[in-house]
Amino acid sequence: MIYGIGTDIIKIARIEAALGRHGDRFAERVLGVEELEKYHRRKAKVAARGLRFLATRFAAKEAFSKAIGLGMHMPMTWRAAQILNAPSGQPIVVTSGKLAEFMQENGLTAQVSITDEVEYAVAFVIVEKK
């Protein structure tokens, strides 16, 4: 049964501006440990790839927060939800801490789809109740 649906679109230039103002502290605030490692690897190869990666993760977390009905309020925090990849490459939502407890206690699972184009990053999340 569908518990919630969330979507988000962000102009990549907004993320670029935030990085310009705050440097990598912005990425450190938004990304979990594994995401941050991947961000730095991509950024080291091509700066634009790092930027797009950060923008898609930002959009996915916003969409996820909407789908679970909490917005960015506890137990939902930027770093408690990571958007990682299954071995197939499919993006997956991995939660930790109080957010993982919330998901388990409520019998929730999430499916996420992300994409980016020159100017925008978009994410769509469906949360299901078992």
From Swiss-Prot:
Which molecular function GO terms apply here? Answer: holo-[acyl-carrier-protein] synthase activity; magnesium ion binding
InterPro entries (alphabetical) = 4-PPantetheinyl_Trfase_dom, 4-PPantetheinyl_Trfase_dom_sf, ACPS, Ppantetheine-prot_Trfase_dom
In this chain, Mg(2+) is annotated as bound at D8, E62
Q: What class of enzyme is it?
A: transferase
Q: State its location(s).
A: Cytoplasm
Recorded GO CC terms: cytoplasm
The alphabetical list of record keywords is:
Cytoplasm, Fatty acid biosynthesis, Fatty acid metabolism, Lipid biosynthesis, Lipid metabolism, Magnesium, Metal-binding, Transferase
| Keyword presence, Membrane | no
Catalytic activity, reaction form = apo-[ACP] + CoA = holo-[ACP] + adenosine 3',5'-bisphosphate + H(+)
- Give the GO biological process terms: fatty acid biosynthetic process
Q: What cofactor does its activity depend on?
A: Mg(2+)
**What EC designation does it have?**
2.7.8.7
The family database entries (Pfam families) matched by this protein are listed as: ACPS
Where this protein primarily resides, as one coarse class? cytoplasm
Indicate the family of this protein. Answer: Belongs to the P-Pant transferase superfamily. AcpS family.
Q: What does this protein's UniProt record list under function? A: Transfers the 4'-phosphopantetheine moiety from coenzyme A to a Ser of acyl-carrier-protein.
**Protein name (database record):** Holo-[acyl-carrier-protein] synthase
